[in-house]
Every structure is written in structure tokens, then in C-alpha cells.
Amino acid sequence: MGEVTAEEVEKFLDSNIGFAKQYYNFHYRGKVISDLLGAKEAAVDFSNYHDVNSVEESEIIFDLLRDVQENLQAEKCTFNVMKKLCFLLRADRMSLFMYRTRNGIAELATRLFNVHKDAVLEDCLVMPDSEIVFPLDMGVVGHVAHSKKIANVPNTEEDEHFCDFVDNLTEYQTKNILASPIMNGKDVVAIIMAVNKIDEPHFTKRDEEILLKYLNFVNLIMKVFHLSYLHNCETRRGQILLWSGSKVFEELTDIERQFHKALYTVRAFLNCDRYSVGLLDMTKQKEFFDVWPVLMGEAPAYSGPRTPDGREINFYKVIDYILHGKEDIKVIPNPPADHWALVSGLPTYVAQNGLICNIMNAPAEDFFEFQKEPLDESGWMIKNVLSMPIVNKKEEIVGVATFYNRKDGKPFDDMDETLMESLTQFLGWSVLNPDTYESMNKLENRKDIFQDIVKYHVKCDNEEIQKILKTREVYGKEPWECEEEELAEILQGELPDAESYEINKFHFSDLPLTELELVKCGIQMYYELRVVDKFHIPQEALVRFMYSLSKGYRRITYHNWRHGFNVGQTMFSLLVTGKLKRYFTDLEALAMVTAAFCHDIDHRGTNNLYQMKSQNPLAKLHGSSILERHHLEFGKTLLRDESLNIFQNLNRRQHEHAIHMMDIAIIATDLALYFKKRTMFQKIVDQSKTYESTQEWTQYMMLEQTRKEIVMAMMMTACDLSAITKPWEVQSKVALLVAAEFWEQGDLERTVLQQNPIPMMDRNKADELPKLQVGFIDFVCTFVYKEFSRFHEEITPMLDGITNNRKEWKALADEYEAKMKALEEEKQKQQAAKQAASGNQPGGNPLQGAPASKSCCIQ
């Protein structure tokens, strides 16, 4: 048998396709695929132009796919596609133009230029300072970007869109062009352009098909790398906002420190060599002494640029962050005009117009004068710049942030603008924190100043204290120069006797005494409680405190110093005469009497409801028990003054407990709380009756802090209402004072608030006062004193007093009712007589007394 020739084998395989396929799959398929995957490069001869078969084209496509997988640089992958397209299209050159917007204006810039089949990437990659930029209304590439359609120009000399601008720059003649847009959805990403068909007069329809087919790879490359870039940018953006946010909320007091902490922390995510922040002076109106020289012609008026809200542009501080080489931060107060970040005029322009400015090639910029030589010995030069305003919530420009030289050498793009704008916008909004803090700080300082003014006028001065502590008269020196024994000796002669003045009696009346005598009586109560020596209260401080309290009460009709003293005196009487002191420690008794004296200090003569209706600042400051909380704060303010602080020698625990008791006692005077606590007090009274001996009950109560506080709260109510228990000759006068103050509030409600007051505060219903007093006694007061007399029978005189006063008011109310009834009966008799007389007259109208019709009348 002879040898089989190649022609015979080929003929056999063509006739037996199934056998050929089976044999190939079994013996060669694995090896071929392995060799193909292991190949580093497509085995296609690119040295000369020729038509490629399907196998060679498959190798080219596979090579492109592998290139996309292995390369991390979009330009390199696109460059490889363009080299192969040059071969497939037989184009002399190809170029890639990237679509971008600069300062809101769309343009096309060269990214890969003069690519041919034998080109090297480094020769074709265009640096930012060498790029050629086309507006969209210029050249074939501009037309393609605008129309978003492929363009085949057979003869450039006959095409209306062709521009020889690049030919003149490169001394190259473009004869024909094939250009196509690279799209991402409906948006143009880039333009790819092939020029000068080799061996043929122009590009053909077949070339258009090849270009569009291979543009799928370019689209894939662009999308992959664009998504990767977007992911990187969003990651950086998130990190920037996260870290800057953490630093912004660390520093709430000062805008400079806030900006510095935030900007320094995010430096690694900004992807630039340097950035500079200029802070603007926020002064809108000059002081008169700065304006006078201008008005007098001695100094020229400011004629420079201004911010959109009219402020003179003055960078009072510049902070430079240098990130290349050795990191450095420079803070320049009052920077000179020739500072490297300001000399170009760009920050001033941004502050003036509030625009974002993206300078992609700073050395070639002609509007701003950037330094073209190195800035320092490091040789660093400005290449590209991104500058944007920092705007606060009021839309005021507070500063300008300028970023220099993107680290990869490319100019700043849209994503950089978005990222930097997010940072500056966040910083601008965060200015609200230091602004708010500054406003609060100013308010706090004003409050301290006004508080100091009030204390100056309220505090007992060195002349007033001599009315009680007559140290000059006795010793010829000031109180602070005297020993405590010397002060005690003077006070012993000045203070009234408790028994003779009856300051421990429930029927005590302040009417015969002067206000100074009431101050002396108040001081004496502290000695009667034996707390002065026990707690080492400085006697000068005690005198000054009581005198200052008397001055702290306003000169109003009822809630004045006399009322404040009476409440303190009743508290003293309940503790001493009413035997309630047995439940409380000496420290608590000290706090309770002090709270009683302070409980209505700086009262305005109007109640809590009026504060809310009139939108008084107190109502905004305190949500509930408005006036009571104000009285408490006023009293504590006096106690914070060293010269008035009668608690100054208490230890920390004692001081906290005393203030705690004062808090409860003064807030408890709010009658709105009275109805909540009286049931609890009644249960305590009932419980006291279950104990066999007073001693056991006392020991139990001394250990029950909550029950003691409830009893104290009810004691404050009993003290505040104690005027209703005084002898009739006193109570009747005080009731008129209370009513007069209520009527004054009613007048305010009628005139200021344009509202009708309730009957208790209506001056026009003054005759109903006895009836209102009876209702007040029955509804509010009787329960308090009835329960206290049941709790401690020593307090029964107060119940007797209110019972007697109710009889007096009831008698007056009945008298008034009888009088009104008699007047009404007399009026009815007169009307009846008038009607009878009218009906008996000749021709009289019998219907005269009937109500008149609204629709007709009888003639």
C-alpha cells in the first residue's frame, strides 16, 4: 500500500466531517486551547497590512479581552485596541479625544494622539500640559460629539466641519477621517478618530463596520474603568465626609480649629499635592472711627472686589497644607497680597463671584497670573488648580478652598469637583456650629453682665449694712475687719427679741413693722434655729443676704418683701411652734427657712399663665412652674455670691442636700402642683395616727426622706397661703392687697393681651370679692390647715383663723347677695308697676310689654 498524500487526507476529512470533528476533539482540542490561553500575544503579523482571516481575528479579539483583564490602566487598554484598529482599518494614525466639562463648558481634549500600528504608549499618551483642546463647535470631532453619530469624511478639503488647526500645529496633512463617538448610555464619553486611509482614497462602509464592532471593546474598557473610578471617588467622598464630620463635631467652638481639624484629617483622600484655605473677614459694617478718615477725605475709599453680599474681600488668615515631600502645615495670619496662594487672584475671584474654577493648565492660563517658576527649593510648580467657595447656611462665603496638582498628573475632573464641593459644602454648613456656639457664648456673657448689674443693685452695699451692723459707730472699722465675736455683740443689741415681736406666733402681723425691722426679724430666726454657730455662717454674709433678699423683691402691691418675710416667718413658726422641726435636721431647717424667704423674689405681680400668654422670656426658659423656677434661680444666684453665701462653710454633701431641699421647697409653691401632692400628704397624716407614740413616729419619719419632702412641700403651701389664717383685721387688709394685684393683672390682660380676665382678676367685679374668697377658702385652703391640725394639733390656731375668716367673708358675701337680691326685687317691682300703668291708660296698647317684632311693627 502506497503513502497517503495530504490531498487525499484533506479530501477524506472533507467527506467525513463527523469523524474529523470527533478525532480533533479527542486528540487536539485540549492542547490547542491550552496553547491559545498560554499565548502572551496574538500570533498575527502586524508588520505589514493585509487582510486577516477569521482565526487571526479571533486571536486579536481574545488578545483584547485578556488585555482588559490584566491591565489596570484605561489608556493602555484603549491604546492596544487603537493599534489593532489602525492595522484592521489600514489607517495611518488614530487619536482619542476625551469629553469633559471645564467650569461648566463642554470640550474635547486629546488623551491618546498619533497612535499607529507600531506605536509605543509613552509616545502617544498626552500629558495635561500638552493636550489639544477642541470646543464642541470646532472640527470634525466637535461635530461628532454634538451629533453623537459616526462621521466618514472622504475629503477633508470639501468638508465644512474640518479644521486644520491640528495640522498646522503638527505639520501633518489630514486627507480623510473616520470618527465615531464612544457612548455611555446617552452621554458622550470620548471621540475616537482614524485619519488617512492607506492604499485607498478614503475609508469605506466596511471600515465603518469594523470600527463600530471594535468600539464595543473600547466601550467595555471605558465602562469598567469608569465604574472603578466612580467607586474609588465615592469611597473617597464617603471617607472625607465621615472623617471631616467626626472632626467637625469634635470642635464646636472655633471655626478656624474646626476647619483645620477636618481638612488635616482628610488630606490623604484629597489626591492633590497641596491645598490652601483662605478665611474671609465676616465684618459687614465698619466702625465709625474707620469710616471717618474716608468721609473726611484723609483716606481713599475701598474700591476693591466685594463678596456677593457686599463685604470687602479680606483674607484674615490662610492655612497651607503641603502634602508632597515632607508634610507641612503653615498658618499665615493677615497674609500679604503676594502670598503664593493669593497672588494669582484666583481665590479673590472665587470669593467675589462664588463660582467653582477648574484651571486645567495653570502655566498657560492668561486670566490668572500663576507663578510659572518653582515656588520653593523643592522645585514644585503649579500645574492644575481647583478652587471653590466655602458657603454657610446663610449663603455667605466664609472662605475659599484651593487645591493644587492632582497626584496622577491629570487635571481635576467633574468627580474631583463633586468630591471637593461635598467637602467645602459640609464645612460651610458646619459653620453653623461655631456660629451658634458664639451666639450662645455672647448670650451667656450678656447674661453674666446683666446678672452682675442686677446683683450690684440688689446686693447690700457697705452703707446699707451699717444700718444693722454698725461697726463704724461701735468699733470705727468695716464689718470685714471685725471678728465674729464683735459682730455677734453688735447684732445682740440690734436684733429684736423673738418673744416680744411674736415672730414664732401664727398670728404674727408685719403691718406695724418697717421693712428694715422685718430684715432684723429674719436674721433673728436663724439664731433662734441655732444654725449660725453650728454651720459657721459668717454673720456679715447673713446680714448682707437678708438685706439683699429684701431688695430683690419688687415694689409691687402684694408679692413684695413683706409677703416673702411672712412666708419665712410662717415656716419658722411651723418648725418651732408647730413642732414639725422634730422630723428635720438642723441643715434641712436652715434650707427650708431660706427657701421660704426666697420663694417669691423678683415676682412681677402676674401669674404663670400671664407669662405664657404674653410670651415672656421666662416662659420660654422654663417649661413649667415658670415663676417658681425663676425665684429659685434668683435665690441661688445670690447664694453663689461669696459675700452673700450663707452656705459657704458647708461641706459638699451638706451643700448639695441644702440646695436639693430648696429646689423642692420653692417649686412646691406652684399651686398647680398642690392638687397632686395633697393626697400623698393625707396618707402620711393617716399613717401617723397608726403609731402608738410620737417618738416612734418621729423616728420613722426622720429616716423617710421622701415623706419628709412631701411634708415640707405642703408646709410651703401652708406658708404661702398663711395670710388667709391671720386675724380678721389683718386678713381683710391683706386680701385687698391680693385683689388689687389681681386686678392690675386683669387690666394688663384687657389692654395688652386684648382678652377678658377671669372674674377674680376683673376690676369690674370687685363687689364679688367676698364670694370669691369663700370659694378660694373652701376649694384650696381649708384642706391644708385641716390636715396639718390633724397631723399636729399645735397647728390648730391656723385652722381656727381660717375658719373665723371664712365666717367673716361669708357674712359679707351673704350681705352682698341679700343686697343684690333686694335690688333685683325692687327693679322687678318698678318694671311691673310701669307695665301696669301703661296698660290701664285709655287707648293703651295691651301688647306694650310684649317683645318687639324683628320683622314688623304695629302702627
Swiss-Prot record:
<keyword id="KW-1003">Cell membrane</keyword>
<feature type="active site" description="Proton donor">
    <location>
        <position position="559"/>
    </location>
</feature>
<feature type="domain" description="GAF 1">
    <location>
        <begin position="73"/>
        <end position="222"/>
    </location>
</feature>
<feature type="binding site">
    <location>
        <position position="563"/>
    </location>
    <ligand>
        <name>a divalent metal cation 1</name>
    </ligand>
</feature>
<dbReference type="InterPro" id="IPR003018">
    <property type="entry name" value="GAF"/>
</dbReference>
<feature type="binding site">
    <location>
        <position position="720"/>
    </location>
    <ligand>
        <name>a divalent metal cation 1</name>
    </ligand>
</feature>
<keyword id="KW-0472">Membrane</keyword>
<feature type="propeptide" description="Removed in mature form">
    <location>
        <begin position="857"/>
        <end position="859"/>
    </location>
</feature>
<keyword id="KW-0007">Acetylation</keyword>
<keyword id="KW-0636">Prenylation</keyword>
<dbReference type="GO" id="GO:0001750">
    <property type="term" value="C:photoreceptor outer segment"/>
</dbReference>
<feature type="lipid moiety-binding region" description="S-farnesyl cysteine">
    <location>
        <position position="856"/>
    </location>
</feature>
<keyword id="KW-0140">cGMP</keyword>
<comment type="similarity">
    <text>Belongs to the cyclic nucleotide phosphodiesterase family.</text>
</comment>
<dbReference type="Pfam" id="PF00233">
    <property type="entry name" value="PDEase_I"/>
</dbReference>
<feature type="domain" description="PDEase">
    <location>
        <begin position="483"/>
        <end position="816"/>
    </location>
</feature>
<dbReference type="InterPro" id="IPR003607">
    <property type="entry name" value="HD/PDEase_dom"/>
</dbReference>
<dbReference type="GO" id="GO:0046872">
    <property type="term" value="F:metal ion binding"/>
</dbReference>
<feature type="modified residue" description="Cysteine methyl ester">
    <location>
        <position position="856"/>
    </location>
</feature>
<dbReference type="GO" id="GO:0007601">
    <property type="term" value="P:visual perception"/>
</dbReference>
<feature type="binding site">
    <location>
        <position position="599"/>
    </location>
    <ligand>
        <name>a divalent metal cation 1</name>
    </ligand>
</feature>
<feature type="modified residue" description="N-acetylglycine">
    <location>
        <position position="2"/>
    </location>
</feature>
<feature type="binding site">
    <location>
        <position position="600"/>
    </location>
    <ligand>
        <name>a divalent metal cation 1</name>
    </ligand>
</feature>
<keyword id="KW-0479">Metal-binding</keyword>
<dbReference type="InterPro" id="IPR023174">
    <property type="entry name" value="PDEase_CS"/>
</dbReference>
<dbReference type="Pfam" id="PF01590">
    <property type="entry name" value="GAF"/>
</dbReference>
<feature type="binding site">
    <location>
        <position position="600"/>
    </location>
    <ligand>
        <name>a divalent metal cation 2</name>
    </ligand>
</feature>
<comment type="subunit">
    <text>Oligomer composed of two catalytic chains (alpha and beta), an inhibitory chain (gamma) and the delta chain.</text>
</comment>
<keyword id="KW-0378">Hydrolase</keyword>
<keyword id="KW-0716">Sensory transduction</keyword>
<comment type="function">
    <text>Rod-specific cGMP phosphodiesterase that catalyzes the hydrolysis of 3',5'-cyclic GMP. This protein participates in processes of transmission and amplification of the visual signal.</text>
</comment>
<keyword id="KW-0966">Cell projection</keyword>
<dbReference type="InterPro" id="IPR023088">
    <property type="entry name" value="PDEase"/>
</dbReference>
<feature type="region of interest" description="Disordered">
    <location>
        <begin position="823"/>
        <end position="859"/>
    </location>
</feature>
<dbReference type="InterPro" id="IPR036971">
    <property type="entry name" value="PDEase_catalytic_dom_sf"/>
</dbReference>
<keyword id="KW-0677">Repeat</keyword>
<dbReference type="InterPro" id="IPR029016">
    <property type="entry name" value="GAF-like_dom_sf"/>
</dbReference>
<dbReference type="GO" id="GO:0005886">
    <property type="term" value="C:plasma membrane"/>
</dbReference>
<dbReference type="GO" id="GO:0060041">
    <property type="term" value="P:retina development in camera-type eye"/>
</dbReference>
<feature type="domain" description="GAF 2">
    <location>
        <begin position="254"/>
        <end position="431"/>
    </location>
</feature>
<dbReference type="InterPro" id="IPR002073">
    <property type="entry name" value="PDEase_catalytic_dom"/>
</dbReference>
<dbReference type="GO" id="GO:0045494">
    <property type="term" value="P:photoreceptor cell maintenance"/>
</dbReference>
